[in-house]
UniProtKB/Swiss-Prot annotation:
Shows a strong immunoreactivity toward tuberculosis (TB) patient sera compared to that of BCG-vaccinated controls. Could be an attractive candidate for serodiagnosis to discriminate patients with active tuberculosis from BCG-vaccinated individuals. Could diagnose both pulmonary and extrapulmonary tuberculosis cases. Can also be used as a novel serodiagnostic marker to detect latent tuberculosis infection (LTBI). It comes from Mycobacterium tuberculosis (strain ATCC 25618 / H37Rv). Belongs to the mycobacterial PPE family. The N-terminal domain is essential for interaction with TLR2 and activation of HIV-1 LTR. The PPE region contains the information necessary for targeting and anchorage to the cell wall. The gene is PPE17. InterPro entries: PPE_C, PPE_dom, PPE_sf. Keywords: Cell wall, Secreted, Virulence. This is PPE family protein PPE17. GO terms for biological process: response to host immune response. It comes from the Bacteria. Induction: Up-regulated under microaerophilic and anaerobic conditions, nutrient starvation and in the presence of palmitic acid. Coexpressed with PE11. The keyword Cell wall biogenesis/degradation does not apply.
Amino acid sequence: MDFTIFPPEFNSLNIQGSARPFLVAANAWKNLSNELSYAASRFESEINGLITSWRGPSSTIMAAAVAPFRAWIVTTASLAELVADHISVVAGAYEAAHAAHVPLPVIETNRLTRLALATTNIFGIHTPAIFALDALYAQYWSQDGEAMNLYATMAAAAARLTPFSPPAPIANPGALARLYELIGSVSETVGSFAAPATKNLPSKLWTLLTKGTYPLTAARISSIPVEYVLAFVEGSNMGQMMGNLAMRSLTPTLKGPLELLPNAVRPAVSATLGNADTIGGLSVPPSWVADKSITPLAKAVPTSAPGGPSGTSWAQLGLASLAGGAVGAVAARTRSGVILRSPAAG
C-alpha cells in the first residue's frame, strides 16, 4: 500500500499512539525465550546426571529417546528470542515514523490559516501567503506518506518469521489410539456393572416405581391387605347367609338332627365366679384340697433337727426364697432389739 495517496491529516492521525504495546510484547517473548533456555539447560543436566549413575543399554535408549525433546526446547527458545527481536525492530520503526510525521495540530493550523486568507483575499493581496501555505501543506503530505511507507516496509519485513513446530509425539499414534479404545471398552464394561439391574424387573413394576405418582400408588398398595380382610369377613357372612337359606329349605325331618349337630361336636362350656377352693388366702384347684396327704414341710421336719445345713455360707443362699413359707415358718425369729451375750461375759 502506498501511503502517499492519503492526505497528511489521515497519516498523522493514525500514528499518534506510542510504541509501548510493541515493547511490552517484545519483553514477554524475551522472558519466554529465557525460560525455555533455562529449561533446556536443566533438562540436559538431569539427563547427564542420570546417565552417569545408570549405565547400560536401557540408559542409552532413554537418552536417545529424550534427545529430540531437548532439541525442540532449544529450537523453540531460539525462535521466541527471534520474535522478541523482530517486535523490537517494529517498535523502533514505529517510533521513527511517529517522529517523522507532522503533528496533526500543525497541519490543522496550516489549513485554517489558508482558509482565512482565501476568505479575505479580495484584491489578491494574500495570494503569495496562500501559495506558501499550499507548498508547506504539500511538504507535509509527502513527509507523512514517506514515513508511513518506511514504517510499513519495516513492519512487513519483521513479520516474516520462522513458524513454530510442535514437539515430536511421545508415543506411537496407532498404539495410543488402541489404548483409547481399550479405555473406552473398560469404561463401558464398568458402567454396565454399575448400572441398576432394571432388565430383571418386570416392566410394569419398573414403570410403577419410576412414575411420578409413586406416593399415591404406595398408599394404594398399603390398603390391599385391609381389603383382603374385609373380603374375608364379607365372605364368612355370605357363607352364614347361604347356610341359613339352606337350612330353611330343608324338611323338618332333616332340620332337627342338623341343628343338634354343633352341640354334639362341640362340648358345652360352663363357668362359675367366686367359688374356688382356697388354702389360706390363695385360690387353688379342687384337686389340691381333696388330696389330704400333702403335709407342710415345716411340720414334717422334727424340731430337734439341726438348725442349718452344713457347708459354706454360699450353700444357704438356696433357702433364702423359702423365708416365710413352710421351712421359714418353724425358724426362730430373733428380735432385732435383743443383743445376745455370752454367760462367760457376766
